[in-house]
Amino acid sequence: MTIMRKTHPLVKIINHSFIDLPTPSNISSWWNFGSLLGLCLVVQILTGLFLAMHYTSDTSTAFSSVAHICRDVNYGWLIRYMHANGASMFFICLFLHVGRGIYYGSYNMIETWNMGIILLFAVMATAFMGYVLPWGQMSFWGATVITNLLSAIPYIGSTLVEWIWGGFSVDKATLTRFFAFHFILPFIITALVMVHLLFLHETGSNNPTGLNSDADKIPFHPYYTIKDFLGVLMLLMTFMVLVLFLPDILGDPDNYTPANPLNTPPHIKPEWYFLFAYAILRSIPNKLGGVLALILSILVLALMPLLHTSKQRTLAFRPITQTMYWILVADLLILTWIGGQPVEYPFIIIGQTASIAYFTIIVILMPMAGMIENNILNLD
């Protein structure tokens, strides 16, 4: 009798995706982040579901309902902090996952890569709307500032902003619709993840050498299930240390003050994982230019397959491009730092320099380095 997992119409799909999947024998721990992102998504959906049972999306009670969850609901404080810090862990894994993709040339799997970019936008939109829900000062002013950016769109901008707000300012209608979108988007993300995996399994995984590994495949289970489990343990350990010992370390103290439209906080800034994009937005004095730069800061990733000039797929054996890559990583850390600083000298000029460097490295320097390496190795 054939094993059920190989014949059952539903189980065999899972079997081909997670059990008998032919996987390169040499993929490193950098390939763990896909499963960790899956775990983060599950944690966020579950904690979010339990929070939604007690949260009220009304401007007069939203802030109090979050306080009620933390004080009166059984383990409500744990669920709330797991959800808030779960978003941070999600973005750490996302950035490392994208960074791995750039380093090892995984962007050459174009469909998978573009699906990943769409996922990144969807997760960023979800996180932004989630940040508005507690209805603290930074929630309110963050929502006001970011939604206002749409008014930079020529002709329809102002109408569009009022349409999104559901009125003439961020108010009850805005909060209600943001809650609705924040609830539905993770399920849309789950569907997009399935498409992402579908595209990935069409080509098979990349590997650290960038060479074709068809001649040397091993089954995903037990080899990579056990390897992923180690990653899961490490992630959960870091996550629970953060949740139980430093729950507010990544949050903004201003969000413990209820939203007040009459009182603007001294420094309006988003959560840490958006600071790099916020710094790029602020470094351009023109509103529309800033919005375009903000969108392009993520959309530039879609150009990476077109900008790949090297005859080798990964950066593993390309020291010049490796140097460019690590300068880019440092540049993103600088942008993250600048995004959290006030708009004054010397932060403005540092932010502008780092923003120019960000686009220059990706669009000009890395492709040039690839061509130079081809030349040195006589690969032309």
From Swiss-Prot:
Molecular function GO terms recorded: metal ion binding; ubiquinol-cytochrome-c reductase activity
Record-listed a ubiquinone binding positions: 201
Keywords: Electron transport, Heme, Iron, Membrane, Metal-binding, Mitochondrion, Mitochondrion inner membrane, Respiratory chain, Transmembrane, Transmembrane helix, Transport, Ubiquinone
GO cellular component: mitochondrial inner membrane; respiratory chain complex III
Cross-referenced Pfam families: Cytochrom_B_C, Cytochrome_B
Superkingdom of the source species: Eukaryota
Residue positions binding heme b b566: 97, 196
Comment on bound cofactor: Binds 2 heme b groups non-covalently.
Membrane topology field: Multi-pass membrane protein
Compartment(s) where it occurs, according to its Swiss-Prot or TrEMBL record: Mitochondrion inner membrane
Sequence positions that bind heme b b562: 83, 182
Cofactor: heme b
Transmembrane spans: 33-53, 77-98, 113-133, 178-198, 226-246, 288-308, 320-340, 347-367
InterPro entries in alphabetical order: Cyt_b/b6_C, Cyt_b/b6_C_sf, Cyt_b/b6_N, Cytb/b6-like_sf, Cytochrome_b, Cytochrome_b_C_euk/bac, Cytochrome_b_N_euk/bac, Di-haem_cyt_TM
One of the GO biological process terms: mitochondrial electron transport, ubiquinol to cytochrome c
Described purpose of this protein according to its UniProt entry: Component of the ubiquinol-cytochrome c reductase complex (complex III or cytochrome b-c1 complex) that is part of the mitochondrial respiratory chain. The b-c1 complex mediates electron transfer from ubiquinol to cytochrome c. Contributes to the generation of a proton gradient across the mitochondrial membrane that is then used for ATP synthesis.
Binding partners and assembly: The cytochrome bc1 complex contains 11 subunits: 3 respiratory subunits (MT-CYB, CYC1 and UQCRFS1), 2 core proteins (UQCRC1 and UQCRC2) and 6 low-molecular weight proteins (UQCRH/QCR6, UQCRB/QCR7, UQCRQ/QCR8, UQCR10/QCR9, UQCR11/QCR10 and a cleavage product of UQCRFS1). This cytochrome bc1 complex then forms a dimer.
More info: Heme 1 (or BL or b562) is low-potential and absorbs at about 562 nm, and heme 2 (or BH or b566) is high-potential and absorbs at about 566 nm.
Similarity comment: Belongs to the cytochrome b family.
Name of the protein described by the UniProt record: Cytochrome b
Provenance organism: Stenocranius gregalis
